[in-house]
């Protein structure tokens, strides 16, 4: 079974896509799953992996499969600030700044991320990383995998969003190998 996060899939009309809203929702979903099923595994992409790690650290999930996970949100936000030529002082002063690419940078979000690091993740994890990922650097995902003893697979021609037939085939093969 799967769920859509706000702004995704069947929930595109919902707009509150912040960790302080999504993490409690995911914890509620996990509580429901634990009442109805014994073995629970997690499959998440991108920011869904980040939110899941915040929500499920310290739980009894058997295994996690992450595709193109955001494993260092602070680094990503700081990179986005650099790309948009926004200083921390500017973001602090304005609170929110919308970039030319349509992304909204938020001082509150950055502060929240800094106050809630991904420290407690100990669930056995396999990661499929795209060699052409522009959201998370290879060094960042490699360091995360080493720190958290995660199995890391790199699909060199992949992009952050696996979407071409070849990328989807590679992802499916990886998923089957990690069931």
Set out the residue ranges of the language-model regions.
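Nucleotide-sugar donor-binding loop of glycosyltransferases
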Residues: 4, 46, 131
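Short secondary-structure capping/turn micro-motifs that flank functional sites
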Residues: 9-10, 49-50, 72, 161
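Conserved alpha/beta-hydrolase
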Residues: 1-12
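Gly/Ala-rich beta-loop-alpha elbow adjacent to hydrolase catalytic centers
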Residues: 43-52
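Aromatic pocket-lining residues of Rossmann-like dinucleotide-binding sites
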Residues: 55-56
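Conserved SAM-binding loop
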Residues: 2-3, 44, 66
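The alpha/beta-hydrolase serine catalytic core
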Residues: 39, 59-143, 147-154, 158-178
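Alpha/beta-hydrolase active-site loop
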Residues: 16-35
């Amino acid at each position: 079974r799967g769920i859509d996060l706000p702004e995704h899939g069947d929930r595109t009309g919902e707009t509150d896509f912040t960790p302080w809203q999504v993490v409690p929702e995911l914890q509620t979903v996990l509580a429901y799953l634990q009442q109805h099923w014994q073995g629970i595994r997690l499959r998440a992409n991108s920011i869904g992996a980040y939110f899941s790690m915040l929500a499920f650290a310290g739980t009894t999930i058997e295994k996690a499969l992450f595709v193109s996970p955001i494993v260092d949100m602070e680094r990503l936000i700081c990179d986005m600030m650099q790309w948009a030529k926004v200083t921390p002082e500017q973001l602090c002063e304005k609170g929110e700044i919308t970039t030319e690419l349509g992304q909204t940078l938020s001082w509150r979000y950055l502060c929240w991320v800094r106050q809630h690091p991904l420290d407690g993740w100990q669930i056995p994890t396999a990661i499929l990383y795209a060699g052409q990922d522009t959201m998370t650097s290879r060094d960042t995902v490699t360091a995360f995998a080493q720190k958290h003893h995660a199995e890391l697979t790199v699909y060199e021609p992949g992009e952050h969003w696996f979407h071409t037939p070849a990328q989807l085939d590679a992802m499916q093969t990886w998923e089957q190998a990690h069931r």
